[in-house]
């Protein structure tokens, strides 16, 4: 089963490395372009690019997914499934419809709670006691596709973004291996279940205004924000 991996940051790199370790047939990695960082504004590669190159896997870094060159590259790679983890851009319909088994997203929440860009931060800020990872078949909506598998973890009072991010990245790596093995064995439709639209919450991108402490809030709310 040929796999194209689409992801950018460390969260995605953890899953990518796990797929390599488990000998999945990764035929390409799609990631964001290199970006300038630091005082010298030197171009730095995304973590997924570094991992892919270390394994000898072709890297694609399109500025936009709508250009003809990338469309042709994806068609040439002919993936059976595309795995998506924190890629950073919405996927156009032709990408969603390219692979035989669809695009499988590793999302860092227990959907339908915390659909959107910042599920880890938002669950901490809301004082949630548990969260997890969901693997889902992507559709045109924002994290609205059919759920394949999920795995939970508790959130302790001592957790912060870093500790929870690291735990969820490991959990996501484990879960995507499980999901892909079942897809390989023809069990995708057995896993597939419609995602409920009840009790939905949205994890909007963290803005500067979210980082301002409102001292009129309770001590618990202030602690969770920090």
Indicate residue ranges for each PLM-predicted region.
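A structural microfeature
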Residues: 28, 61, 148-149
């Amino acid at each position: 089963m040929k796999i194209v991996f689409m992801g950018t940051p460390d969260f995605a790199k953890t899953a990518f490395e796990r797929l390599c370790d488990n000998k999945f047939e990764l035929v390409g990695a799609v990631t964001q372009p290199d970006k300038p960082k630091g005082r010298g504004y030197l171009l730095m590669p995304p973590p997924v690019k570094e991992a892919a190159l270390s394994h000898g896997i072709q890297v694609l870094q399109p500025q936009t997914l709508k250009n003809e060159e990338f469309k042709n590259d994806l068609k040439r790679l002919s993936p059976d499934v595309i795995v998506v983890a924190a890629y950073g851009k919405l996927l156009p319909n032709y990408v969603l419809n390219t692979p035989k088994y669809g695009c499988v997203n590793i999302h860092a929440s227990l959907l339908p709670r915390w659909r959107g860009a910042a599920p880890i931060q938002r669950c901490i800020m809301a004082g949630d006691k548990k969260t997890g990872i969901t693997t889902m078949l992507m559709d045109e909506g924002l994290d609205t596709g059919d759920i394949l598998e999920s795995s939970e973890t508790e959130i302790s009072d001592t957790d912060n973004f870093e500790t929870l991010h690291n735990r969820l990245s490991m959990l996501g790596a484990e879960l995507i291996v499980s999901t892909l093995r079942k897809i390989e064995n023809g069990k995708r439709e057995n896993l597939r279940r419609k995602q409920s639209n009840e009790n939905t919450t949205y994890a909007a991108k963290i803005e500067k205004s979210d980082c301002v402490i409102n001292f009129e809030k309770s001590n618990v709310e202030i602690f969770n924000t920090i």
